[in-house]
């Protein structure tokens, strides 16, 4: 929201809601972080799939398509046989990685407190890990 904007008015298209919408998908931040931290901002689909344990190929492709529509990554199809598809961070994606890193750093610094939270049914983490 712009300075002076009434924060009681949370329109569907306001910036804070759009940012939280990006974070609300389970894999988006992990894919951004993985592209940036492990692959210097660009990687092929198979490399990303091997770098993200627990994600299905279908979910990876679905998330990559959504990230492309959001302007976070660019999809480049190389003219090889068979065609090779490579994904790279856009300038917006590079800027978003900074925010992802802040959240991940906070998680690392507060892991003890997070461990005390009640486990969510969708969490695969077991107590004692």
What are these regions (language model features)?
Residues 1-9:
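Acidic-glycine-rich active-site phosphate/pyrophosphate-binding loop
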Residues 2, 13, 33, 98-129:
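Amphipathic alpha-helical dimerization/coiled-coil segments
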Residues 10-59:
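N-terminal helix-turn-helix DNA-binding core of bacterial DNA-binding proteins
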Residues 28, 40, 69-72, 108, ...:
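Generic structural signal for secondary-structure transition and capping sites
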Residues 45-81:
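Canonical helix-turn-helix DNA-binding module
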Residues 79-103:
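Basic, amphipathic "hinge/linker" alpha-helix immediately C-terminal to the N-terminal HTH DNA-binding motif
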């Amino acid at each position: 929201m712009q300075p002076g904007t009434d924060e009681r008015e949370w329109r569907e298209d306001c910036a804070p809601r759009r940012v939280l919408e990006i974070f609300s998908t389970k894999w988006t931040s992990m894919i951004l972080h993985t592209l940036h931290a492990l692959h210097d901002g660009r990687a092929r689909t198979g490399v990303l799939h091997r770098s993200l344990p627990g994600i299905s190929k279908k979910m990876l492709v679905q998330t990559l398509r959504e990230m492309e529509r959001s302007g976070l990554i660019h999809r480049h199809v190389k003219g090889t046989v068979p065609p090779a598809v490579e994904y790279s961070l856009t300038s917006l994606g590079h800027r978003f990685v900074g925010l992802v890193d802040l959240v991940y750093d906070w998680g690392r610094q507060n892991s003890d407190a997070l461990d005390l939270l009640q486990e969510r049914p969708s969490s695969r983490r077991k107590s004692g890990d």
